[in-house]
Curated annotation (Swiss-Prot):
Residue ranges with Basic and acidic residues bias: 606-616, 625-637
Domain called WW: residue spans: 9-42, 56-89
Keyword entries, A-Z: Coiled coil, Cytoplasm, Repeat, Repressor, Transcription, Transcription regulation
Protein name: Protein WWC2
BP-aspect Gene Ontology terms: negative regulation of cell population proliferation
Family: Belongs to the WWC family.
Length: 1171
């Protein structure tokens, strides 16, 4: 076919080109009198199939078009169909594959949680039955009271004090199991529904089914719009119901307050008048302002500068936190780590059930019931023995990363709120726009165009809040489960019946309304502050919008990417030298290090033979405590005070006095009884190593049983023993009795089991800690072999860790073995062999304590001498040239190659426009590399060049520049000071970074000479605003916007799921409101027990009260902070895409499909009746 003059092929004969009323081109075939959208010449010029296409070509018969509501869609003129998927790409197939893979993961997780629910049901049924039987036993035994160390009975199961503690602990366990089962039932229902929804979507959208056409996609978007309106209406109703609950709660409190006496009311009224008059006086003084207007304007300017600096620091902190979050390794599936947690918790629940079956009461049980329980116990033990997979170190590291991620998210939320508040303050100070440093020009966070609410093209974030790093309604972690999981991770070889299983009798020792999140503890905040990257030099000049910490053209340093302090906070191994810090904050990621260190210490002790060792091995707790762990140094003046507390009870009036909660044994001076100079441990007394600490942050008393030795002195070889710990007298609302795992007795046994008792300091001082070594037989009756009592009246509440060996005195007379008699004869030095007198035993213990005191004083003196010789930190500072040597090899290569020097937030054109309106003029977030784990605060300098000589001594060096440093050169740094006399010197001077103003930007120079490159960025004037990778950014955003029919179906089903769950929440709030109104109508003045004891109801009411107290301005700030937080979450995803090469669309799709099976119950249903 001949071509026209312009090279275009002519139309065939009988064909004509025309345009419709929309301006779209179509073709008329006059031969057949038909019209067609397809150019007849395309058959000759375009590929006929997708396999022949090159680049972005479409084959013959296909056309791409754009719809304002849907976006880009594709038309198949041959089949006369439309579709929203790009036929050239395989993203839809990849989505279907990921959905099928996740269905397998979700099915496994669902079966695990069902089994966990079934085990909890068994535990609840057993606990209810045990509670009834213990109550009956207490009623029968209440008339007869036996001594704790009475030798008349072989069992202390029905000792009144122990029995009362058993009853209260069982009661607390029943309540907790009821609440957990109620919550798990609702979560299981949601997860089953979500799993079924995903199955329906998979069946509908796979198997050769075609996607949605343009008309169907528009119908789905219209339905989505109506559902979101309904959700918005439901959210408003939810807020109204919560406010109603707050008013009802206040009415209950008012009814309680009316019972007070009239004088109290008068005094309160007088106080209110005083406070009112004072407020009126203050208000009057504020209106009568006198002074010069110029002074006020200068003060306002100073306040603006102060707020702007704080605003800059908040922005910089946000950038640092985003980078740190992006550096953390992401999970293969969101929530995949939760599945591993549930598997570990299933093992733990089985161990708890096995332990409860071991200690079940056989009283008034038939032989058939006993055999059934014994068969269940054997079956559980076989199941646990068959568990081959143990918690690996990799899983422990993932859990530590998850805890670090939670801490960073919490800090990011706080910084976001702070930035929003500072912006509002700046806005109120300035009548016009934000006239502060250009580095602070984030702009109005309340901009409607900058809103991050999800549009029709967005993800499900506005519906479900399932961002990778931001979930506002995520409940606080259960401390009991955190500790159980922590101990499970220490078992490196799975379930070992002959060793301790790191579980406690119930471990629900923290009362529900006294629990707080572990991240609120002071040490957790301190650790996160230590891990924070160093602050950059703050801008003080309003002309320095183009200033940076690097020369023109050099890539910006991402703050904290290779900060050593951050790397130190993410250690991959368990640091055994951090025991004091670990005990200062008992959370998951630090308890891992703690228990690892304790295990190392106890393992080292177990390898040592007890025979032939003298007094230091048997009685010096401080020396053995320093075997592998560096404990806090004790003040020698406090040693005598601690000795008055840490003693063992003897069979005397003092031991009986321990029952009353006040136990103060006499302390004799050293050397008072010279006849007992020999070590009592030679005589074979069993000992237990305990670690005690009071956690003032959580109001919890922490008890750790580390190990026991010389056990065979009280029990025959092959018997099964365990420890029983009780805090007496018992409390009705707190678990106070715990048991370790039963295991065969050996000479030395490692326990490493932790128990927590939620108790106040005042109450703890009235308690006595009782530790008993017991054995259990086939009759399930406890036989107390030996024990000790520790008075807590003088216990130190300074968060110090107290490690001590306690001698266990026998509860009844035990004949000495032949070998022990021979040792006692050889060591008695002309003393006749006779039965031990218990008063002599007490004297011997006091003698041992006195010698131990002298040893500890000597060690404390040595520590003081070492501190004088080596003041400062325990770890020496790192040399500058060694700072980068601690980095991993591949990270150093990335640093040098510039892979991490990409712009941290490369937004799309649309997002950039919104963010420019949201933030104003974007700014560079400066950063420096920290050479030390605890970096000093940088010196604030003016943006103009400095004329004084000020150079830092400790500097960080790039690895490749290390070899080029001469005697006259200093290493290249980002935070070095600028000296004008050296800025333009022709000779070889220090390398520097020039911070420039607009006035002298043309005089910029590079730190290093580079080869000549025409039109290089660094050779242009800094006044030119260079676009940063705009074409690539547009392509990236276009790919991320790509939407398939599967995405539309997921959006629709997620909206329906969110609406259904919101309706359930509304119904729960209506039921609770109705119940409170009925109670109020009956004249009751106290809230129901389920509201007072359930921590979820407490969080709900506190959240409602906080919202009720907020003003409109504060509510607006909260909404703006939430929007900014969502944007930060998206920025983290983009940074992760750059650093870890995880496509943003893959992250978004994974979040969508995991939303259905990750149910978080924010509003609980009314719990069952109490016991």
């Amino acid at each position: 076919m001949p071509r026209k003059g312009n090279g275009q092929l002519p139309l065939p004969d009988g064909w004509e080109e025309a345009r419709d009323y929309d301006g779209k081109v179509f073709y008329i075939d006059h031969n057949s009198r038909q019209t067609s959208w397809i150019d007849p010449r395309d058959r000759l010029t375009k590929p006929l199939s997708f396999a022949d296409c090159v680049g972005n070509e479409l084959p013959w018969g296909w056309e791409s078009s754009y719809d304002p509501q849907i976006g880009v869609y594709f038309i198949n003129h041959i089949n006369q169909t439309t579709q929203i998927e790009d036929p050239r790409k395989l993203w839809r197939n990849e989505q279907e594959r990921m959905l099928k893979d996740y269905l397998m993961v979700a099915q496994d997780a669902l079966s695990t949680q069902k089994e966990l629910y079934h085990i909890k049901e068994q535990r609840l049924a057993l606990a209810l039955d045990e509670y009834v039987r213990l109550n009956d036993a207490y009623k029968e035994k209440s008339s007869s009271r036996t001594s704790l160390f009475s030798g008349s009975s072989s069992s202390t199961k029905y000792d009144p004090d122990i029995l009362k503690a058993e009853i209260s602990t069982t009661k607390v366990r029943v309540k907790k199991l009821k609440r957990e089962l109620s919550q798990m039932k609702q979560e299981l229902l949601y997860k089953e529904q979500g799993f079924e929804t995903l199955q329906r979507i998979d069946q509908k959208m796979s198997g050769g089914q075609s996607g949605y056409e343009l008309r169907e996609a528009k119908d789905i978007l219209s339905e989505l719009k109506s559902i979101r309106k309904a959700i918005s209406t439901g959210e408003k109703e939810k807020q109204d119901l919560m406010q109603s609950l707050v008013k009802l709660k206040e009415r209950f409190h008012l009814e309680e307050a009316r019972g007070r006496s009239e004088p109290d009311l008068r005094s309160n009224l007088a106080n209110s008048h005083l406070s009112l008059s004072r407020q009126t006086l203050d208000a009057g003084s504020q209106t009568d302002i006198s002074g010069d207007i110029g002074v006020r304007s200068r003060s306002n300017l100073a306040e603006k500068v102060r707020l702007s600096l704080q605003y800059e620091e908040a922005k910089r902190s946000m950038a640092n936190l985003k980078i740190e979050l992006a550096k953390l390794d992401s999970e293969a599936w969101p929530g995949a780590l939760d599945v591993e947690k549930e598997k570990l918790m299933l093992i733990n629940e089985k161990e708890e059930l096995l332990k409860e079956l071991q200690f079940v009461t056989t009283r008034r049980r038939t032989q058939g019931e006993i055999e059934r329980l014994e068969g269940e116990r054997r079956r559980l033990e076989e199941e646990l023995l068959s568990v081959k997979s143990s918690p690996s170190k990799a899983l422990a590291e993932q859990l530590k990363i998850q805890e670090k991620k939670k801490e960073l998210v919490k800090k990011l939320e706080e910084v976001t709120k702070s930035a929003t508040y500072l912006h509002s303050q700046l806005k109120s100070l300035s009548a016009s726009t934000l006239s502060v440093s250009s580095g602070s020009s984030i702009g109005s966070l309340a901009s409607s165009r900058g809103s991050l609410n999800t549009s029709s093209r967005g993800s499900l974030n506005s519906l479900s809040s399932t961002d990778l790093y931001y979930n506002q309604n995520e409940p606080a972690a259960d401390l009991d489960y955190q500790y159980k999981l922590d101990f499970l991770l220490q078992e490196k070889s799975g379930y070992i019946p002959c060793g301790p299983i790191t579980t406690i009798h119930e471990n629900e020792v923290v009362h529900c309304h006294e629990r707080i999140d572990y991240t609120n503890s002071p040490t957790a905040q301190q650790d996160t502050q230590d891990a924070k990257p160093p602050k950059s030099v703050t801008s003080l000049s309003s002309l320095s919008s183009l200033s940076s910490l690097s020369p023109p053209g050099s890539p910006p340093v991402l703050e904290g990417v290779f900060s050593l302090c951050t790397q130190d906070s993410l250690r991959t191994g368990f640091e055994i030298s951090e025991l004091p810090e670990s005990f200062a904050d008992m959370n998951l990621h630090e308890n891992l290090q703690l228990m690892e260190s304790v295990a190392g210490e106890s393992q080292a002790l177990a390898e040592r033979k007890s025979t032939g060792e003298g007094l230091r091995h048997q009685s010096s707790a401080s020396q053995e405590g320093r075997t592998d762990i560096e404990f806090p140094r004790k003040n020698p003046d406090r040693v005598q005070e601690e000795k008055a507390m840490c003693v063992s009870a003897a069979v005397s009036d003092e031991s009986v006095a321990g029952d009353s909660g006040v136990y103060e044994p006499s302390v004799k001076p050293p050397g008072e009884d010279p006849v007992f100079n020999d070590d009592y441990s030679i005589l074979g007394a069993a000992q237990a190593q305990l670690i005690l600490r009071y956690d003032s942050g959580n109001s919890s008393f922490v008890i750790i049983i580390v190990k026991a030795r010389n056990n065979l002195s009280y029990v025959q070889f092959g018997s099964r023993i365990y420890f029983r710990v009780a805090v007496l007298p018992s409390s009705n609302d707190t678990s106070c009795l715990f048991r370790t795992k039963v295991y065969p007795a050996t000479e030395s046994v490692l326990f490493n089991e932790l128990f927590r008792v939620s108790i106040s300091q005042t109450t703890l001082q009235q308690k006595t800690l009782r530790v008993d070594m017991c054995s259990v037989g086939k009759t399930h009756r406890e036989d107390c072999l030996a024990g000790t009592q520790i008075s807590l009246a003088d216990f130190s509440f300074s968060n110090d860790v107290h490690t001590q060996w306690y001698t266990l005195l026998p509860s009844r007379t035990i004949p000495l073995h032949k070998e022990q008699l021979e040792k006692s004869v050889l060591s008695a030095s002309n003393t006749q062999t006779a039965a031990l007198d218990l008063d002599a035993v007490s004297a011997l213990l006091e003698r041992t304590s006195a010698e131990l005191e002298a040893v500890e004083q000597e060690l404390a003196q040595e520590d003081d001498d070492q501190e004088q010789l080596c003041p400062g930190d325990d770890w020496p500072e790192m040399a500058p040239e060694e700072s980068f040597s601690t980095l991993e090899e591949h990270e150093a290569d990335l640093l040098l190659s510039g892979e991490y020097y990409a712009v941290p937030l490369q937004l799309s054109s649309e997002t950039t426009e919104k963010s420019e309106e949201l933030y104003g003029e974007t700014s560079n977030w400066d950063s420096v590399v920290s050479p030390l784990p605890q970096a000093e605060l940088p010196t604030l300098v003016d943006k103009e060049t400095n004329t004084e000589e000020a150079l830092q001594e400790n500097l960080s060096v790039r690895p490749k520049e290390r070899a080029n440093l001469g005697s006259r050169q200093r290493p290249f740094v980002r935070n070095s000071m600028i000296v004008r006399s050296q800025t333009f010197s022709p000779g070889e001077k220090n390398q520097y970074i020039c911070r420039l103003n607009r006035s002298d930007s043309d005089s910029s120079t590079l730190a290093k000479k580079s080869p000549f490159i025409r039109n290089a960025n660094e050779r242009r004037s800094l006044r030119v605003k260079r676009p940063i990778c705009q074409p690539m950014t547009r392509r990236t955003v276009h790919e991320c916007r790509e939407r398939t029919s599967l995405d539309l179906e997921l959006d629709l089903q997620a909206s329906l799921t969110r609406q259904s769950r919101l309706n359930d929440e509304l119904q729960s709030l209506r039921d609770l409101k109705q119940r409170l109104e009925e109670m109020k109508a009956r004249g009751e003045t106290e809230l129901p027990t389920c509201v007072l004891e359930d921590e979820r109801f407490q969080r709900l009411l506190k959240q409602a009260e906080k919202q009720a107290e907020q003003s409109k301005e504060e509510q607006k700030q909260g909404l703006n902070a939430e929007k900014l937080m969502r944007k930060a979450s998206k920025d983290v995803c983009r940074l992760r895409e750059q650093s870890q090469k995880v496509p943003l669309q893959v992250q978004s799709f994974r979040e969508k499909i995991t939303y259905f099976t990750r149910a978080k119950i924010s509003i609980p249903s009314l719990s069952a009746d109490d016991v």
